[in-house]
Amino acid sequence: KFADENFQLKH
């Protein structure tokens, strides 16, 4: 996924 990675990066 890309959204999952984005979420982890954002948090």
Curated annotation (Swiss-Prot):
Cell compartment(s), UniProt: Cytoplasm
Summary of activators and inhibitors of this protein: Binds cyclosporin A (CsA). CsA mediates some of its effects via an inhibitory action on PPIase.
Main subcellular location of this protein, as a coarse class: cytoplasm
Catalytic activity: [protein]-peptidylproline (omega=180) = [protein]-peptidylproline (omega=0)
Domain of life, source organism: Eukaryota
EC supergroup of this enzyme: isomerase
Domain PPIase cyclophilin-type: 1-11
GO molecular function: peptidyl-prolyl cis-trans isomerase activity
UniProt keyword Cytoplasm, yes or no: yes
Keyword terms of this UniProt record: Allergen, Cytoplasm, Isomerase, Rotamase
Function of the protein: PPIases accelerate the folding of proteins. It catalyzes the cis-trans isomerization of proline imidic peptide bonds in oligopeptides.
Family (UniProt): Belongs to the cyclophilin-type PPIase family.
Protein name: Peptidyl-prolyl cis-trans isomerase
Organism: Penicillium glabrum (Penicillium frequentans)
